[in-house]
Amino acid sequence: MKKTLVSLFVLFTAILASAQSRQDVEKLRTEVESNLVENILPFWLNNAVDPDGGFHGAIGIDGKAIKGAERGTLTTARILWTFARAYRQYGLEEYKVMADYAAENLINNCIDKKYGGLFWAIDGDGAVKDGTKMTYATAFGIYSLSEHFRATGNRKSLDTAIELGAKTFVCGVNKDR
């Protein structure tokens, strides 16, 4: 999945760099947006949510969950940011529902309530699988919760983002916790 995203980014950048006119750029923008709205967002809406709670750890190109895959909290934060931003851009209720679900999952299952930070991975029941805390994941958690607040006005997301920032970056990171 990572290779595909990197390849798409490189392709998009190359095409954009070679665009000869504003019309070419506009055509490319329209095609990319169409792919986002018609393919990418629906794929995640239809396949990411695990009926047992949270999100699948990995999904094949066929849309089927890969059993036993680790559930990275960074994925939850990325889903949250993506659908909050999509809701803010397009105003579709289904995007808000997905963003709200992701926010609740992130807040309730992925954050270390005692010391701050996002755990690296959780299991299917929401229990900590890998308690390592990476600054990148925590920063993306703050970023995604902030976007959720911006898109929906959800105060719990803003308060959680502020608390995460205070515990993690203002008070300092305790590597033992």
Regions from the language model: what does each represent?
Residues 1-23:
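Bacterial Sec-dependent N-terminal signal peptides
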Residues 20-177:
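Glycan-recognition and catalytic cores of secretory/periplasmic carbohydrate-active enzymes
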